[in-house]
Amino acid sequence: MSISVNCPTCQTKVEWSEKSPARPFCSERCKLIDLGEWANEEKSIPGEPVVIANDDYNNEESDY
């Protein structure tokens, strides 16, 4: 018996097996769409933002 999941991008049923190399996505296209949404900050993990203090870092003096 195989398990099926919905593609997070398009909701198409995807068999959870070696036959579906892009799982949980139905395709590489849906995988890249999801990656783009994270990169554009359209998706995020819920919770309070974390502020990382670093006294050695000064944005104005950075060479990068």
UniProtKB/Swiss-Prot annotation:
Amino acids binding Zn(2+): 7, 10, 26, 30
GO term, biological process aspect, one: regulation of DNA-templated transcription
UniProt keyword list: Metal-binding, Zinc
Gene3D superfamilies: Erythroid Transcription Factor GATA-1, subunit A (3.30.50.10)
GO molecular function, one term: DNA topoisomerase type II (double strand cut, ATP-hydrolyzing) inhibitor activity
Tree of life domain: Bacteria
Cofactor entry: Zn(2+)
Region (Disordered): 44-64
Protein's UniProt keywords contain Ribosomal protein: no
Cofactor comment text: Binds 1 zinc ion.
Role: Inhibits all the catalytic activities of DNA gyrase by preventing its interaction with DNA. Acts by binding directly to the C-terminal domain of GyrB, which probably disrupts DNA binding by the gyrase.
Assembly: Interacts with GyrB.
HAMAP family registered for this protein in UniProt: DNA_gyrase_inhibitor_YacG
Stored PANTHER family: DNA GYRASE INHIBITOR YACG
Family to which this protein belongs: Belongs to the DNA gyrase inhibitor YacG family.
UniProt-recorded name of the protein: DNA gyrase inhibitor YacG
Source species of the chain: Idiomarina loihiensis (strain ATCC BAA-735 / DSM 15497 / L2-TR)
Gene: yacG
